[in-house]
């Protein structure tokens, strides 16, 4: 597979505009809608039931509404069972009463999570993300000069924020499993970026007279086929899980679907371009400083 040489740096401002738009859309959605946090983070009760005769999600929603349970999450599994999730403060007995009004059913599973436990999980989730980002920054700082580490961590934060924003826009449930998948996406994204950075570092040693922008163009072009092939494989695998994996795997694989696309684009158009523009900015600042007499 051969691809024509592309001047990626030439088009970096277009990628910046797209990235800024996606970040603003994500921020707007997070501010106005927030996230559909699962019971792991909010506390509550999950009931999984099997009706003797098939019922629709709308029937269950309507029955719950009649007993004044308006914020329940109702899902259908691949096997036709119904999952009902209610927040802390709602009574499971009312849910069973509502379900009984529809028809006979068998309770397959019940899971209760207290508000104290969910609060601790929220704190741990935030610290997990912060620790991961700081750890990656330290790793990149040791492996490369700080300029590359900064560009890599900014691109990574960009990827994670857009993935979280996608969950807000679609209002898909965010559980501990989803959080784990987002951290996996972060690892995949930074690995993709590191491959490009390695090639840039190698070319800087081999082609010392070449401008940094040309070095970046050359390095990205040398890796583009590998990046596309790897990303396509992960994307297609994630798509299969999303389409045929059921509700739980669907929510998890959604992070991979969005993360692979955003991470691939950022490793090609954003991370290395940020390194170049930060370096240019620092040079301008240095020139503007008054020289000491």
Stretches with model-predicted labels:
Residues 1-293:
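A structural signal for conserved, well-ordered secondary-structure elements
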């Amino acid at each position: 597979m051969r691809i024509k040489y592309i001047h990626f740096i030439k088009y970096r401002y277009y990628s910046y505009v797209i990235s800024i738009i996606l970040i603003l859309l994500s921020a707007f959605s997070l501010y106005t809608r927030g996230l559909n946090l699962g019971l792991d983070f909010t506390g509550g009760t999950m009931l999984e039931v099997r009706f003797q005769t098939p019922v629709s999600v709308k029937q269950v929603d309507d029955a719950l509404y009649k007993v004044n349970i308006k914020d329940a999450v109702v899902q259908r599994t691949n096997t036709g069972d119904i999952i009902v999730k209610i927040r802390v403060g709602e009574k499971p007995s009312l849910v069973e009463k509502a379900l009984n009004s529809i028809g006979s059913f068998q309770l397959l599973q019940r899971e209760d999570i207290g508000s104290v436990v969910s609060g601790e999980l929220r704190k741990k989730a935030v610290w997990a993300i912060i620790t991961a980002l700081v750890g990656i920054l330290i790793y990149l700082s040791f492996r490369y000069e700080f300029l590359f580490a900064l560009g890599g961590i900014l691109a990574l934060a960009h990827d994670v924020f857009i993935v979280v924003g996608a969950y807000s826009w679609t209002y898909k449930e965010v559980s501990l499993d989803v959080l784990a998948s987002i951290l996996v996406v972060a690892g995949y994204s930074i690995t993709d970026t590191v491959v490009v950075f390695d090639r840039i570092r190698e070319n800087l040693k081999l082609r010392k007279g070449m401008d940094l922008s040309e070095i970046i163009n050359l390095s990205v072009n040398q890796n583009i086929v590998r990046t596309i092939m790897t990303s396509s494989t992960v994307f297609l695998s994630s798509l299969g899980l999303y389409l045929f994996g059921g509700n739980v795997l669907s929510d998890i694989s959604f992070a991979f679907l969005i993360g692979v696309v955003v991470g691939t684009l950022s490793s090609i158009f954003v991370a290395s371009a940020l390194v170049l523009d930060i370096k240019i900015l620092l040079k301008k600042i240095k020139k503007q400083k008054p020289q000491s007499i």
